């Protein structure tokens, strides 16, 4: 079984990763989903984490970009009605999370055989 850490670069996934390494837990791969709209500092942080832990973080990307889904994607809305683009993501319309993070992750994990996925989530 493969042990895969889902790394967002945020405080919770960074802390989880470092704690797992400190405890000597098995980690076969570390994955990061790049939305294409990350702050430049996020890439710097990822590079620093890679250097600190001495391991490569695998970057996953969706097949289509944020800009495509935001403005170009054609979606149907019932009987013959169509609209173009999802527009700004909102709390109740989280297309960005689903299309740019969850779906690429699911697709990748499906190709890995048996796995355990680790996700850092704050307890509060």
Map each language-model feature to its residues.
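ATP-dependent adenylation/nucleotidyltransferase module used to activate substrates
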Residues: 1-124
